[in-house]
């Protein structure tokens, strides 16, 4: 029984090797995440004839190189949640923290929980790439929000008031009508310099050229807002540069989002559960691939409850003495992306209640609303039910595909 504790950091790891009762075979030592350095470690481990467990924390992407290398060498690698390891480490009155101390504690953890059942699913390349694309989409969407705020602050000085008139970014087409409009009509005077009739004609021509549906009421509304607005920047070349530069950057981000989502759909279509997931109500070409990417193989969760806990929407019981908590809040200990997807999914079901009549998730949502639950409480209660159905259906499909 030999426990290898790995304290992972960027580019290197501090490694300690222990046996039961605190016998230290190797004191903490640093190894770079390179094949030559890790080969020295495996050469030393190969000399042992006892069973070896390697334990490390899940630290974003830092642990992936050493974990992949050791798994390739057929070592039993156990990746532990950092929160669980932190609670294990902080049991004393004094809690010093260094890489060496952490490596010893992780190795000791491996001995204390040696016989704990551990399930390790190895994803294929398609799922790994899909997960990476899903993370990239999430980060790029954050960038888009920042760029939208920048553009909005500029529009408030050049063409205030048009925020809710024009459509925003469309995930399905990759188009953004509002940013396209302000790129060409970057200032209120670029609209009011024409008569209303002349602007409507020009707006119709612009809509046709850009591939948007023309609406005369929309054109008149834009003209009215521009005429009544109070711009605080002049219609100069400098203002034009500021607006168009902000739009140009936003377009590049939009194009990146569209390309990522398109590629995610292409990869997801090659997976056996794609059709089953896309048939579920509320799931479209935007949510579907991202949901598949984030959950991965649902069979890695021992039950639907584990999947719900992974999403962080579980409500753990709380009881002490004669008190039993009945109104519990979500733990929010899981994936933020899963909760974001859950909100998007349930928002779609909420908006299309008539179309989804008879769907068990939609019916459950409406039942909770009828009980007087707040909208978001009902939404995540229904999302809980959705994940139970997802786990059952997709696991069944994947099991059949193996036969």
Q: Where on the chain are the PLM-derived regions?
A:
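A detector of single, family-specific signature residues
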Residues: 1-403
